[in-house]
Each structure stands twice: as structure tokens, then as C-alpha cells.
């Protein structure tokens, strides 16, 4: 597999140049202007954040990407799948409340929020994972599968199991329905190698 190209911009701004303009330059440098968005439904997959948390990309970045897509004839929407754990994103009603409270509304971003795996996280599509060692079929949120184009808008963060999380986790785990997340997490159960166990 070919290595991915990584495009970088810093947060330093000066009069006349803001972070949203820098993001648009980044989208152009990455070649996103070569994508045929005309008439296409475009899922912008991101993490809306838990209520009271600030560890998510700000809505103005989502607006920049949505405006970029709309300027090229696309029809964007913001999306994520429900979570397994107890929190403010475990069902679509609470998830949308969290999105709106954290600033991701149609008024601030210029596009709608659709929870990809439905009201209770059961609206999914089984996708075969060719050569999958741990998962043979991935259960992906239906709205992601129904979109013509998917854009991953991701923040980079530390992760307790993987070391760090980013674009792969945003799509791989974040794109999974609640049932899909359950299957992925179930494979990570600890097991005891009895011959090496010291009974600690």
C-alpha cells in the first residue's frame, strides 16, 4: 500500500489570514478541488464531542469544509455514529443535542447533522472485510454507506489503547454502528496465559 501524503498547516495567523482560510488552502493542496462534488451527497464524518468537553474540532472548521463542498455543487451533511458507552452520544436524540450544544447546528455550519446509525444505533450496513483477521463483516452506519462521498474531518489525540487516534479511528471505529463497535471491542478481551500466570 502506498504511504499516505500528509499535509500540514500551523495555527499561526496574521492580519488578513485566518485559520479557516488556511484550511481551505490545505483542502486545495490535498487535491480536493479535483473531486467531482456536483450533485453528490457528501458525508463529513467528524466527532461532535461530549457535552462539557472541548476535545473536538470547532464547528467553524466543519463550516469551511461544508462551504468548500457546496461551492462545487455538493450537498454536505455532518455525521457520526452513536457510542457504546454512557454519555451524551449514545442515541441520536442526545447525540444531536450534544452536537448542537457544541455548536454544530445547520445555522453555524451551513449543513444538517445526521446521526449515521439512526435513533438507537441499529441502522447499519454489513460490509465484508476482505482478509479481516478480527472482523469478517463491519457494521457501518447506513448514512455513511448511503453517501456518495465521505470526508473524514479529524482531530489528532492520544488514545489509551492505540497510542493515538486520528483519521483511521474516526472512520474505522467512529463509522461503526453501535453493534459494529460492540463487535470490534469484543475482540479486545484480555485472556490469561495460564502457563505464565503467577496469580498476582
Per-segment meaning from a language model:
Residues 1-200:
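N-terminal and secondary-structure boundary signal
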Amino acid at each position: 500500500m502506498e504511504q499516505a501524503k500528509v499535509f500540514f498547516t500551523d495555527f499561526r495567523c496574521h492580519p488578513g489570514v485566518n485559520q479557516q482560510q488556511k484550511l481551505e488552502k490545505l483542502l486545495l493542496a490535498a487535491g480536493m478541488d479535483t473531486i467531482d462534488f456536483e450533485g453528490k451527497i457528501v458525508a463529513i464524518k467528524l466527532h461532535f464531542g461530549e457535552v462539557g468537553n472541548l476535545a473536538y474540532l470547532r464547528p467553524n472548521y466543519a463550516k469551511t469544509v461544508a462551504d468548500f463542498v457546496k461551492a462545487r455543487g455538493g450537498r454536505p451533511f455532518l455525521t457520526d455514529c452513536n457510542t457504546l458507552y454512557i454519555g451524551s452520544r449514545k442515541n441520536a436524540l442526545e447525540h444531536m443535542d450534544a452536537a448542537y450544544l457544541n455548536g454544530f447546528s445547520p445555522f453555524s455550519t451551513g449543513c444538517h447533522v445526521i446521526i449515521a446509525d439512526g435513533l438507537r444505533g441499529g441502522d447499519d450496513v454489513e460490509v465484508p472485510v476482505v482478509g479481516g483477521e478480527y472482523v469478517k463483516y463491519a457494521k457501518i452506519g447506513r448514512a455513511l454507506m448511503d453517501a456518495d462521498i465521505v470526508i473524514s474531518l479529524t482531530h489528532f489525540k492520544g488514545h489509551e489503547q492505540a497510542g493515538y487516534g486520528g483519521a483511521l479511528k474516526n472512520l474505522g471505529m467512529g463509522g461503526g454502528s453501535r453493534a459494529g463497535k460492540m463487535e470490534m471491542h469484543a475482540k479486545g478481551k484480555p485472556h490469561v496465559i495460564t502457563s505464565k500466570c503467577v496469580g498476582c
